[in-house]
């Protein structure tokens, strides 16, 4: 059991060491990346909404 506790401590120590080596984006880069993601999500949302509406209208037209 003691080996497990030491293993957990080593794991978190390794995590901290790895996080220090990470190349974090600047605030400007982070803002740009966030806007790209939000824009992409908005575009895909609108695209699928239009496709869904079109398919629904087509099916409604076939049913009636």
Swiss-Prot record:
Transmembrane residue ranges: 35-55
A GO term from the CC aspect: plasma membrane
InterPro entries to which the protein is assigned, alphabetical: SecE_bac, SecE_sf, Translocase_SecE/Sec61-g
Keyword Chloroplast: no
Keyword annotations from UniProtKB, A to Z: Cell membrane, Membrane, Protein transport, Translocation, Transmembrane, Transmembrane helix, Transport
Compartment(s): Cell membrane
PROSITE patterns, per the entry: SECE_SEC61G (PS01067)
A GO BP annotation: protein targeting
Membrane topology category: Single-pass membrane protein
Entry's Gene Ontology molecular function annotations: protein transmembrane transporter activity
UniProt keyword Magnesium, yes or no: no
Quaternary data: Component of the Sec protein translocase complex. Heterotrimer consisting of SecY, SecE and SecG subunits. The heterotrimers can form oligomers, although 1 heterotrimer is thought to be able to translocate proteins. Interacts with the ribosome. Interacts with SecDF, and other proteins may be involved. Interacts with SecA.
Family according to the record: Belongs to the SecE/SEC61-gamma family.
Function: Essential subunit of the Sec protein translocation channel SecYEG. Clamps together the 2 halves of SecY. May contact the channel plug during translocation.
Protein's UniProt name: Protein translocase subunit SecE
Organism: Halalkalibacterium halodurans (strain ATCC BAA-125 / DSM 18197 / FERM 7344 / JCM 9153 / C-125) (Bacillus halodurans)
Upper classification of the organism: Bacteria, Bacillati, Bacillota, Bacilli, Bacillales
Gene label: secE
